UniProtKB/Swiss-Prot annotation:
Similarity comment: Belongs to the protein kinase superfamily. AGC Ser/Thr protein kinase family. cAMP subfamily.
GO CC term (a single one): axoneme
GN (gene name): PRKACA
Protein known as: cAMP-dependent protein kinase catalytic subunit alpha
Phosphotyrosine, modified sites: 331
GO BP: adenylate cyclase-activating G protein-coupled receptor signaling pathway; adenylate cyclase-inhibiting G protein-coupled receptor signaling pathway; cellular response to cold; cellular response to glucagon stimulus; cellular response to glucose stimulus; cellular response to heat; cellular response to parathyroid hormone stimulus; intracellular potassium ion homeostasis
Activity regulation (record text): Allosterically activated by various compounds, including ATP. Activated by cAMP; the nucleotide acts as a dynamic and allosteric activator by coupling the two lobes of apo PKA, enhancing the enzyme dynamics synchronously and priming it for catalysis.
Enzyme Commission code: 2.7.11.11
Amino acid sequence: MGNAAAAKKGSEQESVKEFLAKAKEDFLKKWENPAQNTAHLDQFERIKTLGTGSFGRVMLVKHMETGNHYAMKILDKQKVVKLKQIEHTLNEKRILQAVNFPFLVKLEFSFKDNSNLYMVMEYVPGGEMFSHLRRIGRFSEPHARFYAAQIVLTFEYLHSLDLIYRDLKPENLLIDQQGYIQVTDFGFAKRVKGRTWTLCGTPEYLAPEIILSKGYNKAVDWWALGVLIYEMAAGYPPFFADQPIQIYEKIVSGKVRFPSHFSSDLKDLLRNLLQVDLTKRFGNLKNGVNDIKNHKWFATTDWIAIYQRKVEAPFIPKFKGPGDTSNFDDYEEEEIRVSINEKCGKEFSEF
């Protein structure tokens, strides 16, 4: 690297530091004093279910006053308690209301009633990366790199706030109208200064240290980034099998095989991210995220332009207008029932 290039890199890294310091100030204000009860169910017209989960569903809704469409996550308090997800749910809302980054889905309102918790988020009509990836088969390396760069920046932001995301997978990445990523589902995100021990995540994406019940840190997100980049570029994840236990055996073995079409730069980056040895895993070394940002596979990436959303996206989802749900699957509809008695009031008092 020439002197001029090195100086440019140095000043870029300095301005990133300043940016993150300011971002942390903004985050901490909201983290310490979370917004509560900023809307009411009656203000929204419920249109269609966009997805379902073990303790709730996500619905497309329309704010009657403004006519804006949103995605409303509805969680059944009793089911959350039964599935021991109180802490995770409180974390999700507290984190989402405090963060602010171009590739994180925005929480617009949150509230609760006798039966449910509600998180009303920006509606991202392009649907999940998962469905586009399955339809197309696999993404070209430049296409995969465009998405990967956004995740790198997002993790750099989250980690600077002591947040671990812990649930990276194509199902949690929505594609917006400009073709950029919106990370959704902060159900497993957690603010951790040191290490944490909870077993959570999706089998194919779990880092070896989580499987081995070791204390783990932010490095699990960089491992998951390796899994995601592999899956985007190959069309299938690096470790897969019929049963989770077989997947776990492959993950901890430290052996990865690459398709022959992977470039040598891509393979090199993935070997450094899918690195079982934490003392060698990129993102976890003394240069932190810069080992990833300065890697040859990202040589053509203009990080600032990606952050500013100035790079032309490789793919724009089809979109027929506000409230279009054609990029989402159909689900059986169900009435939202609200009890006349308050359920689990104590458990969710801080929501």
